[in-house]
Amino acid sequence: SSAASDVYKRQVKFYSALYNAHFLPRAFSDVDGSYPRFDGDGQIMKMDHGTYYCDFSQWDTYRAVHPLFSILTPSRNGDMAHSLVLKGQQGGWLPIFPSWNSYTAAMIGDHCIAMIGDAIVKDTPGFDYEEAYTLMRKNAFEANPDSGSYRDGKGRRAMESYLKYNYVPLEDQVTEAFHRREQVSRTLEYAYDDFVLAQVAKKLGKTDDYKACLLYT
């Protein structure tokens, strides 16, 4: 019947979309837990637990894909958050848009904070919340003073302006970034990420940080 055919077509669309949602991030550790060090020179690291993931396309996955994973496979989502924490520890900064197991400057927001923050608020297992918070806080409260590593993608873009004015003004051309003219969008994305960080700070009992983050939202 036409009704049965319509149901079947919807099922195909649904399960195709569900399948496609699992393409990224991709597992990057071997069966023994070994993986290439993030932003490194080929050094091989070893996972103490779980799977190491790379290629976090954080344009919009923090809005839909990772919340979906938090429902369907929370332990896997925890491994992904743990992988981001490891990247931050190995490279010195929580990455903005980690691809090819390295930093990039190709993102106007800082949505690893949103992804990890969502996992913390939902009590997702598999990673250390305090270690994660230390890295998240650094991204939100500090500007990278090293021009070389900043150019490579370490630290938020235009943070001097954002910390001074609570927004990124039009006059700031946001140099050393793939996107240089999205000042309004960048401000809105940072404000969202800082709101998420505020909720994490509140959950972890960091009252001063909670109040400070809300000033940017």
Q: Positions of the model-derived regions?
A:
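Alpha-helical support elements that line or immediately flank enzyme active sites
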Residues: 16-30, 54, 60-77, 117-122, ...
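Short, small-residue-biased leader/transition segments that mark boundaries at the very start
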Residues: 3-8
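Alpha-helical solenoid repeat scaffolds, predominantly canonical TPR units
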Residues: 80, 210-213
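Active-site-surrounding "flap" and adjacent substrate/cofactor-binding loops of secreted or lumenal enzymes
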Residues: 33-46, 75-99
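Short, conserved helix/loop micro-motifs enriched in His/Cys and acidic residues
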Residues: 39-62
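Short, functional "switch" segments adjacent to catalytic/cofactor/reactive centers
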Residues: 12-16, 20-21, 25-46
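Active-site cavity-forming subdomains of large catalytic enzyme subunits
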Residues: 83-207
